[in-house]
Amino acid sequence: GVQTCALPISFNPLKWGDAFTEGNSWHYTWSVFHDPQGLIDLMGGKDGFNQMMDSVFILPPIFDESYYRAVIHEIREMQIMNMGNYAHGNQPIQHMLYMYNYSGQPWKAQHWIREVMDKLYTPAPDGYCGDEDNGQTSAWYVFSAMGFYPVCPGTDEYVLGTPYFKEMKLHLENGKTVTISAPNNGDDKRYISLMTLNGKEYTKNYLTHQDLMNGATISFKMDVKPNQQRGTKEGDFPYSFSNEFKKKK
């Protein structure tokens, strides 16, 4: 009999919907919360990974809405935000900014997190950047304002961003207090020049849950220029499953 085969369908990373609910491939590519290092390896190493991350913001906010047959509000919000193909108004990509901490360029996380905080959360009628979805978008703000975020809740680590205020205090249920201090913080100072944890210099790109539960004083010295030496060693990177797997081999 006659055999037929389906022709391969061309892949469009800008196409919303279909396999990517309310998003596209540029948004969902980063959804390996437990293993960013595995994704870095698949992209040929840190340089290739960082270039792909950068490309999210370099691309214009163009899209293919053919699956939905209409411009859904998430697409429109991405256009209005005008941060390339980064779509903070929907949840799948919100952790992506923090992934520069896994690839040796934490200052880029600091840059883009502050951009989002300044531009997409404002006290104006149009100052909220999208839908809430069970509190995720506001929870992102609260964590990011403190200067860290739980990229992978299955670990005990909170990945560093950049503090938004000069001081914040967390009063924990166990009676301990976490003090987050950045006295020279300001609109023009988004980069972490120096960080100390309980008075000692701290270079890692994450804090542990135990660090916080013990009570902690976390101090930041902020700067207008990025410190491109801090947090760049692999020993400073947050957890990735691939690294644990490699240790066992």
Regions found by a protein language model. Give the residues of each.
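Short, small-residue-biased leader/transition segments that mark boundaries at the very start
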Residues: 1-7
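Non-catalytic C-terminal accessory modules of carbohydrate-active enzymes
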Residues: 42, 57-66, 86-88, 93-249
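Short acidic (Asp/Glu) and glycine-rich catalytic loops that position anionic groups and cofactors
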Residues: 11-16, 32, 72-77, 89-93, ...
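A post-motif C-terminal structural segment
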Residues: 11-12, 17, 21, 50-57, ...
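A conserved active-site cap/scaffold subdomain adjacent to cofactor or substrate pockets
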Residues: 25-43
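Solvent-exposed loop and edge beta-strand segments that line ligand/cofactor-binding
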Residues: 15-28, 76-90, 130-131
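Gly/Pro-rich turn-and-neighbor structural signature
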Residues: 8-18, 23-30, 107-110, 136
